[in-house]
Amino acid sequence: MNLSQEHAINQNLHKNQKNEEKIEKKTINKDGRGQMNYDGEEGQGEKSRFQKMVENEKIEEPQQKDENIPNTDVIERKEVGVIERINSEDVPILMTDNATDYKVLQHNLKKGKVSKKSKEQIEQISKQEENDMLEYLKNYKSNEEFTIQLEDLLSFETYFSRDELHLLYREFKTISKSGMFMSKEDFISKLTPFSRNADLTISLMNAIDRNGDQKIAFPEFVQALSIMCRGTKKERLRFTFEICDFNGDSLVSRDEVYSTVKAISDIFSKFGYSKDKFGDPSEAVDSIFSSGLTTNGIYLHNKKELTLNEFLERGELNPDLSKCFGMFDYFYLKFIGQIDLLFKDKEINMNGQLTKIKPKTIFNFNISHRRTLSLRDGFLIVYKKKKFKHDEDKPSKVIFLPGSTVKVVVGSQPSKKKKFLSKKFHNYYGFRVTKGNYNRFFLMENRDEALNWVNAIRFHSRQGFRFQSFSKVRSNISVEWFINGSSYYNELAETIRRAKHEIFITGWWVSPYVYLQRDNGIENMEKSRLDRILTEKAKEGVKVYVLMWNETNLGVQLGSRHAKNWLEGCHSNIHVIRHPKRYPLSWSHHQKNAIIDQQIAFVGGIDICLMRYETSKFQLTDDQGKRFPGKDYGNLLGTVIRTGDPKKDQFNRRECPRMPWHDVHTKIVGPSAKDVASNFIQRWNHAIYVERSNRFQPILVPKNYTGLPSDDAKPDKWKNLVSNIRKGFSHVSYGREKPTHYQRAGDNPKVRSHTRQGAFGLQSDQIDNKIDKQKNNSTNSENSENSYSEFDEEDEEGNQEEEDEDEFDEFEKDENQKQENSKIPFNNKPSDAGGLKSKNYKNNNNNNIIESLKDEESFELPGTPKIDLNNDKLLKSIYHLSSNMSENSCVVQMVRSICPWSAGTDVEDSCYKAYLGLIKNAQHFIYIQNLFFISSCGSKLPKNRIALAILNRVRRAITLKEKFRVIIMVPISPSGDLALASSRMIIGWTNRTISQGGQSILELLKNEFPDVDLDQYISFNSIRQWEANGDRIFTEQIYVHSKVLIVDDRVAVIGSCNINDRSMMGSRDSELAVVVSDQSKLLITMNGKPFKVGKFPHTLRVGLWKTHLNLTDSEISSIIDPITDNAFINIWRKTARNNSIIYKEVFGDCILENQRRLGIVQKKYIPKTNELIVQLSQIQGVLIEYPLDMFCESNLFNEQVGIFTAESYVDVSIFT
């Protein structure tokens, strides 16, 4: 082929430039199918170039390369060739982020079965394959079949670079007999794993074989692979539609889609992972065909069949639909995954000036602009090139690249509309970036420059890591947990004061008037008010950005307009955005984060607003308003007024107790904090782009500041260690919270005793290092990304029992003795015979620890006793009394629920996938605290299947006779005032999930296992507090607002996501959570056997139990192993039952959990008598049982719901 022939090809390649911009139209060929061109557009009856080439079965002979043709040798191609390309749409949903496990999965897929080889052997095989691929690229020369011209055509028309095309051709030749064509027999036997499903196999082949000649040419194969693994979401949805359309009638039915999902689900288990992320096949089908609301609140009706347009519309609601429920993952793993791993460590950041083409502007011209582009940290940052001024600190556009697609575009002679362009662009090369509604051409003078930018953008577009999250799994992160608002607010205030550059804050509710520190007098408390701290930092030059939910729901008033005006009036460096402006009316922004200098992030369930400050005392009264001033004294079961004067009380403090607020938050330091900042930047910029009223707000970009904010204010850990050792261990308590409660008449010291908290900060590297040296299994041998949450960690009970036995003997004997001493028979009357009030329960373990100190092999601090590092009892006790931070040892990933309305991106439901995956793979126990527990065991509503995952895991434990425990803690009334029909409906949905309605967890288990005592497996709990004040005794539920999942003390999920469809489906409320495992391992017992757990999730779980059970430090050892009969039955369940019995006897039907029907008047207090005080003093902690029969005699969905109430007209999904 000579130059004129090549130029003719280029002219034909893009002679119809409108195909890049037109609206696609459906055409039906003879068999009823739509004809799709290889660029992903619908055909208009004209055959594509590839179709013509395939029909003629003619590939032109390579000609001698002309000197004028740009150099395409191996070295040059390698520079712009294959890079890590992990796009949101290319990485399989089921893959782990562990490279070895990923290679095992690829090896299984290539062999077509589960390999018996070890991971080490497969690692060696994979390494050899990588070397072979690199050698192939180095020595590759064009041949008679795969010519340079065909290479050019494919690289321009697909999402693959030249090197990738060569490697794909190498793989294709191993499958096909002829080299360029694959027969139907080869396709069925070697390419697809669905040979047993004839309909699916034929449909898939028809989708790839565009000309219908029953053969697949290499160009057809590459184009289909390009769409499946790297195409736009619309392209992949169209391809999915064709695969599911078995009969070619341009409609897909429930049966067709179900057959597809079922076949894929079956084949996945064949290759060694049955960890199905798509749920039950019926769930996937229901998500497409059932009725419901879109992300913008548009109602979709139930459908039996879907057209292409309907399929595309509903595809926006399901993040798995564009993956063809995993089929595209299969092709990615089989053909692309190994290529992506070749350059997995290569990072590409770029800067340069390009010409941007904005299509179809005024007068139907394509307008060109010169732009400066910067590519870094997953963002494409566009700066305007101004004639007199160029300020790179003010970008004109910032594009969050994960989820985007980029494609090389080559042009020939310009059309009439482009003749105004410079002549150097008449034969142009460039690329097109597509992300959501953003669609732009960028032009360059040569191909190599275009390919460099394309490869770099593809690298930064990577997404879809574990749980299909936007965030990578990152190691060596410092994470700190906070139980309740007081400790979190205090740390937040100190961190904000150390900010040097930027402060990001987002929340469901942000109040300028919340006091963050309340322990050091009125003057310091006033200084700690949020608006004053932010103003102080703004005056220092720190930029403050606050993103609030604009309460579009008329039933909720948070005063966001006043908060915006107030904060922006404090200083010009404070910027506030309220989003969205008008719709959706049904959904909300629910993320609760603060980010300091893009280096430190706070993530969890606590908003920075009124009524969230709480201590571990769970104080009910504050007559003088010293700790809870004005509207900070609140009770959700009454009429809450969140707007107006914040200093004005909304309740009579003598008549109404406050409702304590129980929550959990985290502090993250390290690269994962950058992921939280990226999430904020994406949402902030999206709010600017979609709302014209925000156009004057600054656009944010990711920045890499050097040096963490100063940490001088933090207490010295060694000083704490010296002080605590001198005083002895008996005073040491869990966590960092300082004493905050002043004693008053009427306080119950038995209930309040658990509030004494110190700071036993045994966190130093010296101590940890010396301890690690004494362990037989150093955590250094752990793979930095091999966390429990990757699902492939083997059962350590069997693998490590032998090697840990010697180390564990002494500790095991001591633990068994403690358990024997505290096992007491239980009866229904609260007494010293059960729970934590047993006289035999307490032990003097700490005194024994002090007495057991030895002098040999110890370390010494000046003025302190020597600590024996070989004494297991001492070390284990210290571990469980350590602080709430794990420094530089955590494996962290951010997960979220996000969608087009909330962030301008495709639907992401990685929170949901994390919950499903972790629950399904739990080995010993599941611990959940959540505001809501609204889920389904298989019914159409709710749509999320977290309850089903729990049900199936308990089923498996019962069938296999495993000792397995599940604890689920929710509030008694999660939605506030029961006078509202919406609040009653939410309780109704909760009860349907747990114990009522016929399809609940407990009902299904009882029907299936009638002879099994379910109390041995699952416990539903709430928490409640009482307090005497003057001549009255108050009681109130503690509002469980935390969103925590802990599995096996090895992994924890903490964030803002509730267990309901609103939070989990991804297409509704915006959410953010952190998945944490810890490489710092602690050796404990699990069911009495040696078991290694992560320090962070273990200490968090123990800290929560200590708070709920009111444990002293000497009693902690009894809950270290959470699944023994002693911990779960004798302590947890019996304490909850004893406390519930006392509350019922003292308060009767005055409290919600004792009411079986609606309409019974509640009372917040009863007259105080000495007898009642004595009886209530037997309550241990705050734990109670969740009332399974609450309102069982009332229909919460219809009773007291009139035709004039809003609940009668809104869609039921609002409540689920």
Curated annotation (Swiss-Prot):
Biased composition (Low complexity): 776-789
Segments forming domain PH: 347-462
Record protein name field: Phospholipase D B
Subcellular location: Cytoplasmic vesicle; Cytoplasm, Cell cortex
Family assignment from sequence similarity: Belongs to the phospholipase D family.
Control of this protein's activity: Inhibited by butan-1-ol.
Biased composition regions of type Polar residues, renumbered to the chain: 1-14
Chain intervals with Basic and acidic residues compositional bias: 17-33
